[in-house]
Amino acid sequence: MTTMIGQTRQAGSSSYEQAWQAEQAPCPGMEPDTLTVGVVVVTRNPTFFQTGLSVLNDIRDYVFNRVHIQSELPLKLSELASDPLYSEAREKAIHFLKNQSKALNIQVIQCASLAEATGKIIYTHALEQQPEFQMGMLFYDQTSLGNVDDSIEKIDRDLDAFYSAMQRGGIPAFYTTFSTVTFIRDVRSSFRYLPQQYREIVRSEDPAIFQTELLCLWMDFFEMNYTNRRVKPIGALALHNTLAEQLIQFFERTAASRWLVSYYTGSIISNLIGYLDRHAEAHGALVLRGPNEHAIACGAMANWQLYRMPFLGVVTSGMMDEFKGTLINLKETAAQGIIVAAENRNNQWYSFQGTQTPTEDMRDVLAAKRIPYVYIDDVDGIADGLAEVFRLYHQAQGPVVILATQNVLESTLSLEPVPGDLPPVSGLPAYDCPPISDSFEQAMALINEGPEKLVWQLGPVSDDEYALVHEIADAAGLALVDSLAHPGSAPKYYQGKRNPHYLGTLAIYGYSPRVYNFLHTNDKLNPMSDQSVFMIKSRVAQITTPFSDGRLERKVHLVQLTHDERHLSPYADLKLHMDCLTFLRAVKANLHVDAALREKRKALIAAYLDSPSDVVSQLPSLPMSANYFFCQLNRVIENLIKTENFDFTGVYDVGRCGISAVRNVAKTRRGFSGWYGRALMGDALLATSYLAHTSPTHVVAFIGDGAKGIVPDILPAFIDNILTHPQLLNKSITIFYFCNGGLSVINTYQERILFNRTSRQMRLVNVDQPAFEQTVDDFHIQGKTLTHFDEDTIRHALMTPKRLNLFSVVLGHNNEGDGISLATAKGWQRDPSDREALQERKDWAARQPESTSTSFDQGQNKEAIS
């Protein structure tokens, strides 16, 4: 050990100070710099500090004009290890330093904590009035502070506080990823991610490696900060971004409440995203991330359908296609949002990732899909371009795409807010005085005087609309059904109580046996004079019923309500081109249902069995059947609803088990279905990580192994959102992954409809997932495989807040039940629906009090128990 060259004095009982001044410029032609760059070393380890001093001392003759050191540890030099790699790095460093024009003044400050360093720098700066001092590099030795390393998020927060204190104190700082490094004990396990405020390195026990790392870190800082004229010591000052600022202002003005921001980054959009990350939430945005661009569309669609939350999505060049068919789903659901996509200039020749070339043009694709877009390729055109974007946005026909070039995306031009408020619209009919058309009068005649069986299938009704529907159903004796595309639009439980009007699900797949029996007698559709089906907020798309075109045209009396004239169906016997809320208020105002008719209708609803209608749903075979698992799960969930006021938002992916969940598991509110629109496997799974943060209730997702395998793992992005928004997760999020090793719906089509054997095309390979548990802050994540129905585990998982449950449920395949086709409605396991049995149940229903909310099977069970 040798004493460092220069004058050394002990400044106090526990501190040391030393200054060294070069007698001449370190290298010919170098001029002394008037600035002093601070180097802060936070450590309690003498070896760490002294090795760092020795490395600086080893190159002092080639860069330093003056060195001033203040420390709590003794000022000694360690003998550096002889190592060829270190020697090579030193030679390259000296060669680089000799070519610099200025010699550097540095002030080394060693402290035992970050807080002490903050105080010392601010105090010294104020006391000595060093206007030319700039905070340079920070070495943060976690290995000498406490017994374990702090979490990444805590270190990020502490460092952000340090640099913010520098800024408040008027101390310039080089604040880049090269200016701050933290040394930790070992590579982080469980989950890892890139820190935002620093570089992270494991402290090597090998002296040669450690000293080489210190030299490389210093030289990286020197090259990328001090010698780079583009990098200024301005601290954490955020750069301006024109486009991001204008979009934030627009959504703040126009969004009713929260609005959603989501992005998948790229080089030329990173400045825009950085501005959104820093400023959007202060103006009402919720910034969430997904694992890819496709997830942005899925999260936007789910949050628009359920909560009418507008969105802003940002993607880089060439990524418009990554939205897949979900982009069309966004248009079909008329989701209001803006998508910013990077694009090349027209005069670029086959730009990297560009989609405007001599052989393709993304604008033609968007036009073919009838998705409006605005191409902005000049900074001077930002205001006019955004004005057109905002005009298109207010047409409420789906998302609007901004195709913007790099100069536009990175512009820092100051602009006045571009006008974008909703223009006044005149001539809209008042809700309390709707025009009474012949079609409306015919619809009211059906409601007031019509058949005893009146079924309303609800589309994407809002909470206010459903409240009116429920009131009308009670006054008129209506039967309510939901659909595969909009599960829970008519819930089985409403405001914590059993919904007496709810009949089940009517859809192309997954129709309930209770709905089938209600509409059929002896497996034949009831006469059109005996029943009518109202489709509310519906296009009468193929997914809404199991009936063929011929049956819809000749066998089903259909009343359709839609606000969009383009959606009026050729199969509707009565077409109502009206706004839904206007229609419902008009119906309520014109209700005159005879009490006897109302009670007959209610008695009929109660007379039909509420049952899975198959034997295997009660049979605990191994592997479990989907029928059995969902029957047991429904039993648990209904019990929780009744006893614990359990409320949840269901998420249903495309596949047999998504169908089973819609059909068999009780719902308390509207959920999100991947079956909507293009029916894309994986949409629901990707939407789950967004709904976890926006849903006001617990979230339960039903995902097949096919859907799981077709999209990325959502867990990493989920954890990223936990770190950013932990306050939004005081709920349980449960994802059931159903693993039966095959594409079941296709299997059933082959085996039950075409009478073929299954084949390789339907095979899926399930790889066993080991159980795990992980805690992120105070949020718990668990993964577990279920081969049996574990009621205690599931019940606890569903009710425990601040928890993500990932259950892999092992199931077998069968073709039984679940309304996969009308053929399955006639199997030997079905409950009897003959006239005598039905008459018995109708007689029972007629004897019940008017306020009853039980169905026949529940009443029979009570009588048997008594």
Curated annotation (Swiss-Prot):
Superkingdom as given in the UniProt entry: Bacteria
Enzyme class, spelled out: transferase
Catalytic activity, reaction form: (2E)-octenal + pyruvate + H(+) = (S)-3-acetyloctanal + CO2
Gene3D superfamilies named among the record's database cross-references: 3.40.50.970, TPP-binding domain
Residues covered by region (Disordered): 826-866
Associated pathway: Antibiotic biosynthesis; prodigiosin biosynthesis
Bias type Polar residues, positions: 849-866
Phenotypic consequence of gene deletion: Cells lacking this gene show a white phenotype and produce 4-hydroxy-2,2'-bipyrrole-5-carbaldehyde (HBC), 4- methoxy-2,2'-bipyrrole-5-carbaldehyde (MBC) and 4-hydroxy-2,2'-bipyrrole-5-methanol (HBM).
Keywords carried by this UniProt record: Antibiotic biosynthesis, Thiamine pyrophosphate, Transferase
GO MF annotations in UniProt: thiamine pyrophosphate binding; transketolase or transaldolase activity
Enzyme Commission number(s): 2.2.1.12
Listed cofactors: thiamine diphosphate
Any Gene Ontology biological process: antibiotic biosynthetic process
Compositionally biased region (Basic and acidic residues): 828-845
Role played: Involved in the biosynthesis of 2-methyl-3-n-amyl-pyrrole (MAP), one of the terminal products involved in the biosynthesis of the red antibiotic prodigiosin (Pig). Catalyzes the decarboxylation of pyruvate, followed by the modification of the resulting two-carbon fragment acetaldehyde at the C3 position of the 2-octenal (1,2-addition of acetaldehyde) giving 3-acetyloctanal.
Family label: Belongs to the TPP enzyme family.
Full protein name: Thiamine diphosphate dependent-3-acetyloctanal synthase PigD
